[in-house]
Amino acid sequence: MTLPVLIIGAGLSGLTTARLLTNAHIPCIVFEASPPSRTQGYAISLRDWGFNALLRALGNLPLSSLTRAVAPDRHIGGWGWLDQSWRNNQTGEIIMMPPKESKEKPTILRANRNALRQWIADAGVGEDEEIDVRYGHRLVGVQLLREGGDGNVVTAEFANGATYTGSLLIAADGVHSTVRTLILPAVKPEILPVLVYHGDFKLSREEYECVIRPHAGESTIVAGVGDGFNTPLTVCDVTSTTVHMDWTYSRPSIGDNDPLYNPNITSEEAKVIPEALIEEINAKKLGEPWSLFLNGEAMRRHRVFNWLTRCVSMERSDVNSCTGKGVVFVGDSWHAMPIFGGEGGNHAIFDGIELAKMLEVAWGRSKEDVQAAIGKYYDKSWRRCNDAVRRSKQRFYQLHRPISEWIEIAEKQKMRA
């Protein structure tokens, strides 16, 4: 009996890989440290090159099958449209307004992350094609390519005492990858000198229609730019009675004495709202709708997190050495990029598509053929992913430019129109 592929992590890259392997009748098991109830209810932006590739890989599904399942506003007939206009977050004035995209052929759309993960997991080709996900399995050890009765196998050991053997181990466990830490301890995430504060809150549908709709219309995001800082308001999920939303306050660090930047902050400290943050935001004199939610009184009622911005890059020699030991990386485990301005979710999905495609061709052949297939996966994805990490760092600063530069860009666009 063929040993399964062991996939560590039930995020976008892990579930995409597992779904496509399962559809191809390649046995695999996904191990997730969190319980089934874990939530990642915020929304992400999906690019056309990412969601179109996924739809093709799943059997040329129509775009509507995706948007009806994952759009933050799906329950009220929306399709995840986002207005890509940039507004001055003090005056509300539109600085730049690209043409509105059509529902039939968008270049970008918003997706609720929880709903997207569930949709990928459920996108099987038949009733017997359910993904095998084992929750509550936190990886603590790996044994790589030992000789056994079934040939070369990898072994994964978990904190609950469970042990599984497989033909291949896929590291899909994110920026804090346990797999990477165990076998490539010298590769550590880089913390960027930027700050990103994120607040979650809820509105009633009546409040949403009254205070957000006049500014956002049908858009699931209201992008606000200031003088070197950003304050987007985003819709995460809409029901008949409640709207889940979040705000982000982000800017580059202002040096060694920045009271809001602490690269050594603990997870518990990251949940505390610093008074310096409230003072700084109040001093910005934001206009509506941002001022309604980014103010001291409102923020104290929200769940607020200080998100450290981490990036991960690896050398080709690192991944090559792991391939020979039966390990392959997908998603943020080997190319993490900033949440703000990055496209990590899209690249995670694309990794899963590319790897599954290569493994499907080589499956059932020799170990050398499988390793050659993994090499082709890296050949195809290496430049894409490394360039994306580099661009994402640059993009953060481009999106946090002085307001005078935003206005100058807008004026030049008007002259060219």
Swiss-Prot record:
Protein name, entry field: FAD-dependent monooxygenase aptC
Which protein family is it in?
Belongs to the paxM FAD-dependent monooxygenase family.
Identify the pathway: Secondary metabolite biosynthesis
Q: Output the GO biological process annotations, alphabetical, semicolon-separated.
A: asperthecin biosynthetic process; secondary metabolite biosynthetic process
What cofactor(s) does the depicted protein rely on?
Answer: FAD
A GO molecular-function term, please? monooxygenase activity
Q: Which organism is it from?
A: Emericella nidulans (strain FGSC A4 / ATCC 38163 / CBS 112.46 / NRRL 194 / M139) (Aspergillus nidulans)
Inducing stimuli: Expression is induced during late sexual development in the dark.
UniProt-listed Enzyme Commission number(s): 1.14.14.-
Q: What class of enzyme is it?
A: oxidoreductase
Q: Which InterPro entries match?
A: FAD/NAD-bd_sf
